Structure formats: C-alpha cells, structure tokens
Amino acid sequence: MFVDQVKISLKAGDGGNGITAYRREKYVPFGGPAGGDGGKGASVVFEVDEGLRTLLDFRYQRHFKASKGENGQSSNMHGKNAEDLVLKVPPGTIIKNVETDEVLADLVEDGQRAVVAKGGRGGRGNSRFATPRNPAPDFSEKGEPGEELDVSLELKLLADVGLVGFPSVGKSTLLSIVSKAKPKIGAYHFTTIKPNLGVVSTPDQRSFVMADLPGLIEGASDGVGLGHQFLRHVERTKVIVHMIDMSGSEGREPIEDYKVINQELAAYEQRLEDRPQIVVANKMDLPESQDNLNLFKEEIGEDVPVIPVSTITRDNIDQLLYAIADKLEEYKDVDFTVEEEESVGINRVLYKHTPSQDKFTISRDDDGAYVVSGNAIERMFKMTDFNSDPAVRRFARQMRSMGIDDALRERGCKNGDIVRILGGEFEFVE
C-alpha cells in the first residue's frame, strides 16, 4: 500500500535541570557554588533516505517524543546532551506545520536534514548566577521545554514516469503487466485512489520507476474529484504517459479526452504543458478502436506520435517501454524538480521552527483575574523552580524588568488582585 500524506505529533526533548550545589572539599572553607548545568534536550530531525519510497512507517506510529537532557551534577559537572531523534523519510517529502500550513522543509536529496522541533536548552546551575553581591546563590534553573508541534508529511512522488488519463483507461492494468506492482483493478471508475509505484525493466535491461496515478476528470485543476490530490504527484515526473481509451467504450470521444486532460495539466501548472509526453492509444483489441485512432491522428496531426497498445492482449507493450526509456534518456539531464522549486522560491530547507518572540499580552478572565501570556514570559515561567524562594524572587525581578508590573498597573491591577501565567496563580503585591 502507498501512503503519500500523514499527520504526526512531535515533541522535542526538554533540557535537563541545573542544580543547586556547593563545593565541600576539605581545605576549601569558602567553596562557593558548584551546581552544573543541565544537558540540551534532543531535537527532532528529519533525514532523507533514498532507500525509502513511502510514508508507510508513519501510519502506525503518529507520536514521536525525543529524549530529555540529563540534569546537572555537583562539582560543576554538566548534564549530557540528549541525542537527536532522527526520523527517516523518502526523497520528495514536504513537511508542513499543521496549525499554520507553513512549509518547514522540502527534502529532496539523500542525506539532507532539517531540524523541525528544537530541543530545549539545559537549565543553568547555581554557579552561573554567582555575582560579587551574591557569591553563593541558592537557586538554579529548570531545563527549557522542547518544542512541540503537529506536522503533516506530504510525499511528492519522485517517479520517472507518471501515467495520466481519465478513469478506467487501463493505467493500473498497464502497471501490473510491466512491473511487479499489484494495483487494485476493477470495472468501475476511481479504482485507484492512491498512487501505486512499480519498477519497470525493458527487454534491453533499462529500468525506470512508473507511477499509476488516480484518474482525472474535468475540473481537476480546481480540485474536482481527486484533482489536486492527483496533480501534485505529476509535478516531479520526468515523462508523462497519457493513456486514452481509443474504443470510446465509456461514451467519450478520444480526442476530447486528450484535450481535457492536457487542459487540466496546464491549468494546474503551466510547465506541465511542456513536459515530455507519450500518447498511448489503449484498448486497440476492441471494435471501432482502429477507426477512432485514424480520426484521432488526423485531428492532432503528425507532430504528436501515438503508440497503439492493448493491455489485455499485451500487443505492442514492449515497443511502448522502449519509447518511454528512450524519452527518459533524452531528458535525463533535465532536472524538472529544481526548476519548479526555483520558480516558486522554495529552498530545500526553508524553515526551522522558531516561536515568535512577542513580548507579552495581558487579558482578563471571566472571574476578573489578569492573564499574562507570551513566548518569552511563558518560557521563563517553565524554567523557574517555584519550590525555591530565591528562584521565585528572581522570576519577580524578571517580570519587572520586562515591564509586566507597570503594564498590569496600567490595566487597573491593584494590590491583592490575581495574576495568572499558564497554570500558575500569583497575587499582585505593590
């Protein structure tokens, strides 16, 4: 089974906690602070593995949590950094933030990496806070929480050849007889609803990857039917094999099928109109196919070669494979993927998840309590050990230095009012 789109949840590792400790060696009467820093939490990293072809592994595991950094130790020993969690994906994987729909990375080349969820910084030990005024601080810092987000993985096929055409023209049947792929084949429309991949070998030992793609209908470029779901896979194929039911058994005219499909390709992406294309006249074993083929050739002209085949009797299949292999060799040095990436301004690694560092905002709850929110203040809240009075006093000083106290007063906050930050409640004291 081919899986080309999946949503997963990521949680980078929290940083290790710094500790409060002091030197206690013999002959060191004023040892001072000796608490070590916590280690860095593991990041979630995606890496391209060219041996993979699908996102199937992510179908059975949707939640990924990276390791926490080790806590600091006494004698100024720092905790060990956690090893990054590396998730392998096939070439052509696009990673998007589910909440914002922002593209985080477009991974194409083998070994290419992108950090999508960054591990938390390790908390600082008490030795980091020593000053001339306070040479032996009795507080330390908790580790920074790792980033947490939901992402969608979308695999754009990197097949060499894409089979396109109306439903039930024989695309799946062709793939099944020229490769070991076993797509679902049925006597009804849209038997194929997910792409199927197959490795095809020609009689002269040339090989390529062929993709049987869901059938198109008129309006696909506007999202009708399986439209966009189908068309995004065509973008990275080097050669398009356009299959047409030359028998007209579905009640459609072959020439109209040909025109509609090409119009939909061009409407979705202008460059697809100029992509190398091989026209295949299928079902030549049925009555009226030859007459329809003659009319078809007259209509499109001699400049467009047409290869007549029958996927049922397998007539002319080898000649079709030779023609595809020849066309691939002709365009082997053309990188359509790079052209498309440059045309839309997409770098191969676009973005590393970084929360916006807005200062803070103040709102009111229904019970009248003041709610302070913002990435910076929430980060400080999470890294403060509220079991330590000195750490709490430091947090209060940080709030004052950020201007939160003054902002609360401007909003009407008075002595004794409740202030909330995340899950914590504080009493405002003048």
Swiss-Prot record:
Required cofactor names: Mg(2+)
Residues annotated to bind GTP: 165-172, 190-194, 212-215, 282-285, 310-312
Broad class of the protein's primary localization: cytoplasm
Binding, Mg(2+): 172, 192
InterPro entries attached to this UniProt entry: G_OBG (IPR031167), GTP-bd (IPR006073), GTP-bd_Obg/CgtA (IPR014100), GTP-bd_prot_GTP1/OBG_C_sf (IPR036346), GTP1-OBG_CS (IPR006074), GTP1_OBG_dom (IPR006169), GTP1_OBG_dom_sf (IPR036726), OBG_GTPase (IPR045086)
Domain spans labelled Obg: 1-158
Ranges for domain OBG-type G: 159-329
Keyword terms: Cytoplasm, GTP-binding, Hydrolase, Magnesium, Metal-binding, Nucleotide-binding
Domain of life: Bacteria
UniProt domain OCT: residue ranges: 352-430
EC number: 3.6.5.-
Annotated stretches, region: Disordered: 118-145
Gene3D superfamilies: GTP-binding protein OBG, C-terminal domain (3.30.300.350), GTP1/OBG domain (2.70.210.12), P-loop containing nucleotide triphosphate hydrolases (3.40.50.300)
Single GO molecular function: magnesium ion binding
GO biological process per UniProt: ribosome biogenesis
Assigned GO CC terms: cytoplasm
Subcellular location: Cytoplasm
Known function: An essential GTPase which binds GTP, GDP and possibly (p)ppGpp with moderate affinity, with high nucleotide exchange rates and a fairly low GTP hydrolysis rate. Plays a role in control of the cell cycle, stress response, ribosome biogenesis and in those bacteria that undergo differentiation, in morphogenesis control.
Subunit organization: Monomer.
Family label: Belongs to the TRAFAC class OBG-HflX-like GTPase superfamily. OBG GTPase family.
Protein name: GTPase Obg
Origin species: Staphylococcus aureus (strain NCTC 8325 / PS 47)
